[in-house]
C-alpha cells in the first residue's frame, strides 16, 4: 500500500505522520512545491519511527514522479482560510491549484482513490473528479467526518459524557450550510432530545456550523489541522482495512435525496473500493430541505467554475 499526501502544511504533515504511526501503508510520500519542506518533515517523521515503533517509509519530494502507483492520494494543498475569509473566497485560487495537482497525480497513478481536504471542500472534490477522470466512487471529500467530530465533541462537553457514547451525523456541504441531523443523534441510544432542551441543541448545532471559523479566529493566521488530519486518516483507515464504515462523506449524488449531479455530504459505506454505497436515511421535512439548500449552494459554486474548468 502506497499513500501520497499532497501539501506538506499543517494538515498534510499531521496526516502523513498519523498514517505512518498507524502503519496504514508501506510507503508514505509527502509532496509540496516548496523545496526542502517535504523532505525535512518527512525525514523527521521517519526518524521518529524508532521511538513510535513503526516501519512505514516516509519520503518527502517536490516531484510528482515519486507519487507513482499510489493507492490513495490525500490532497491538502491550497491556500488556507484567514480571518474574515469565507470558504467561497478561496474558490478561484484553490480550484486552479486542485485542478493542476490532480492532473499531475493522474500522470503517474492510474486508478488511485483521491480524498479531498482542501477548501471549499465540496467544490474542490468536484474539481478533482473532473480533472482526474476517475469513477465517482473513487473521489471523496472529507467533510462530514470532521463536522460530526466537532458536533460530538460539543455534545459530550455539554452533557459531561464520553464522546465514545455519542452517535451523530452531520450532512450537507462543509460550511455554514451543513446539516447536523438531530433526529439521528443519541447518547448510548438515548435520543439527544431527551437529554437537552431544544434551545441548547440549537446552540450546539450553531456552534458546529461555526466550528472551523472559531479556530481560525483563535489562530489568526491559520486554520484547524489536528482534527481535519485525524478525520482524513479515519477515512483512509476505513479504505485500507476495508472496514465498510458507515460515515458521512462528500460524494457525487445522482438523484439520492432529490439531489442531482452535485457533490454533497451524505452517509456512505466506505471500503477498499472507495464509496461502495450511498445510504438514503429518513430525514424530517426541514432536514431534507436544509440538505437540498446546502447542495444548491455547492451546485452554484460549481457552475461558477465552468469557465475555468472548460
From Swiss-Prot:
Principal EC category: oxidoreductase
InterPro entries: L-lactate/malate_DH (IPR001557), Lactate/malate_DH_C (IPR022383), Lactate/malate_DH_N (IPR001236), Lactate_DH/Glyco_Ohase_4_C (IPR015955), Malate_DH_type3 (IPR011275), NAD(P)-bd_dom_sf (IPR036291)
GO MF, one example: L-lactate dehydrogenase activity
Gene Ontology terms: biological process: lactate metabolic process; tricarboxylic acid cycle
NAD in keyword set: yes
Chain sites annotated for binding substrate: 81, 87, 119, 150
Superkingdom of the organism of origin: Bacteria
Disulfide bond sites: none
Residues at the catalytic site: 174
List of residues binding NAD(+): 7-12, 32, 94, 117-119
CDD domains in the cross-refs: LDH-like_MDH (cd01339)
Swiss-Prot/TrEMBL catalytic activity: (S)-malate + NAD(+) = oxaloacetate + NADH + H(+)
EC number(s) per entry: 1.1.1.37
Keyword NAD found: yes
NCBIfam families documented for this protein: MalateDH_bact, PRK06223.1
Protein purpose: Catalyzes the reversible oxidation of malate to oxaloacetate.
Family label: Belongs to the LDH/MDH superfamily. MDH type 3 family.
Protein name: Malate dehydrogenase
Organism whose genome encodes this protein: Pelodictyon phaeoclathratiforme (strain DSM 5477 / BU-1)
Recorded name of the encoding gene: mdh
